[in-house]
Regions:
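An acidic/histidine-cluster motif and surrounding catalytic segment
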Residues: 16-113, 118-179
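Short, basic, low-complexity termini and linkers enriched in Ser/Thr/Gly/Pro
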Residues: 1-17
Length: 179
């Protein structure tokens, strides 16, 4: 079991309490590779479970790229455990996310969600897992965002509350997802 101490929040991370990561991929092998490589640079990746939902091709034109993505994701390492879910028919992004997030968050109680075109910071998993722990009992916090629209940050802390949902790297809990 690995442990990491963050003196600011005094949070102990262990491989037993890290949120699972769910990555949704389709037909962009280069983007998918960049997303995974960025995640692998996170210290907490090795202790995290990664679930990859690979949607099926919409049509014949997409089949080659979908197959390239599927070949690549089978070669991934650097995580505690990797589970690949290959859709046999095309679900579309929205349906795939709803289904995948619902299944995983109901099983684990919390979740980190990414799509195949995001490049995260080496501290992304640390930030998300710490925020999930800090705000788990704060029912007014429905999700944690890893990205924000460009705003004037003068007077704001590194972490602040925002009334909008951002879908470019986010996390939530099972009880909030049910709403």
């Amino acid at each position: 079991m690995t442990q990491e101490n963050n003196s600011k929040f005094n949070i102990q991370h262990s491989t037993l309490d890290l949120a699972p990561i769910v990555l949704f991929v389709y037909n962009r092998p280069d983007h998918t590779k960049q997303t995974v490589e960025a995640l692998q640079k996170n210290k907490l990746a090795i202790g995290s479970e990664l679930f990859i939902y690979s949607d099926a091709a919409k049509n014949e034109n997409a089949e080659q790229k979908v197959n390239e993505v599927r070949e690549y994701i089978k070669s991934i390492d650097g995580f505690k455990k990797i589970t690949i879910i290959e859709r046999e028919k095309n679900w579309g992004l929205a349906n795939s996310i709803i289904d995948g997030v619902t299944k995983i968050v109901n099983e684990y109680g919390k979740i980190i969600v990414l799509e195949d075109d995001l490049v995260t910071s080496p501290y992304f998993l640390k930030f998300m897992n710490e925020a999930l722990e800090i705000y788990k009992d704060e029912e007014k916090v429905w999700h944690i965002s890893g990205w924000n629209y460009p705003i004037d940050t003068k007077g704001l802390d590194d972490v602040f509350f925002w009334r909008l949902m951002n879908c470019w790297g986010w996390a939530t809990w099972a009880d909030r997802w049910k709403h």
